[in-house]
UniProtKB/Swiss-Prot annotation:
It catalyses: 2 superoxide + 2 H(+) = H2O2 + O2. This is Superoxide dismutase [Mn/Fe]. Destroys superoxide anion radicals which are normally produced within the cells and which are toxic to biological systems. Catalyzes the dismutation of superoxide anion radicals into O2 and H2O2 by successive reduction and oxidation of the transition metal ion at the active site. Its EC number is 1.15.1.1. Homotetramer. GO terms for molecular function: metal ion binding; superoxide dismutase activity. Belongs to the iron/manganese superoxide dismutase family. The keyword ATP-binding does not apply. Fe(3+) binds at H27, H75, D161, H165. Keywords: Iron, Manganese, Metal-binding, Oxidoreductase. Pfam families: Sod_Fe_C, Sod_Fe_N. The keyword Metal-binding applies. Its cofactor is Mn(2+); Fe(3+). The lineage of its organism: Bacteria, Bacillati, Actinomycetota, Actinomycetes, Propionibacteriales.
Length: 201
């Protein structure tokens, strides 16, 4: 298999009480695994199509690959973007903190904009803080499903899963409470590392 399911960098219950261990186990072991399997299956079927010179299903196969691979990428970032409360800084500092101040005016402004983007998603999607290498700036984005609405080249720094499977067992349909709780477990060390790497990519 080309793609494999990464291990979580902490125990299922490590993010409690903000995100329950039950959610984390289902989310990682079932949902994320399904995207990994789906991406590998799409690659296999594309290889079969090449061997047979039969591309009648190319549109479906390309969509399947994009959807599942994006789901795998997003979740792989999402897990590392979080850490048990108290194990990482509560807000960004140094170069990332300065960049957020530059592009949003303040950390609180960025947090408010990101929260609005997350809670405003209609249906399933992601809120993301990204580095735009063309504009040399940080933006907030809403992804629909896993890949739609994403400008090519944007590099995710901070990802928040707004699919119902990420919160419904604990927060029901109250997205705002989920997002408010999630801020407590953001791993700003990981976000800062992604920012440093993205700027020189």
């Amino acid at each position: 298999a080309v793609y494999t399911l990464p291990e979580l960098p902490y125990d299922y219950s490590a993010l409690e009480p903000y995100i329950s261990g039950e959610i984390m186990e289902l989310h990682h072991d079932k949902h994320h695994k399904a995207y990994v399997d789906g991406a590998n299956t799409a690659l296999d079927k594309l290889a079969e199509a090449r061997d047979k010179a039969d591309f009648g299903a190319i549109n479906k196969l390309e969509k399947d690959l994009a959807f599942n691979l994006a789901g795998h990428v997003n979740h792989s970032v999402f897990w590392k973007n979080m850490a048990p409360k108290g194990s990482a800084p509560e807000r960004p500092t140094d170069e990332l903190g300065a960049a957020i101040d530059e592009f949003f005016g303040s950390f609180d402004n960025m947090k408010a904009q990101f929260t609005a983007a997350a809670t405003g998603i209609q249906g399933s999607g992601w809120a993301s803080l990204v580095w735009d290498p063309l504009g040399k700036r940080i933006n907030t984005l809403q992804f629909y499903d896993h890949q739609n609405n994403l400008p090519a080249g944007s590099i995710p720094l901070l990802q928040l899963d707004m699919w119902e499977h990420a919160f419904y067992l604990q927060y029901k349909n109250v997205k705002g409470d989920y997002v408010k709780s999630w801020w407590n477990v953001v791993n700003w060390d990981d976000v800062a590392l992604r920012f440093s790497e993205a700027r020189v990519a």
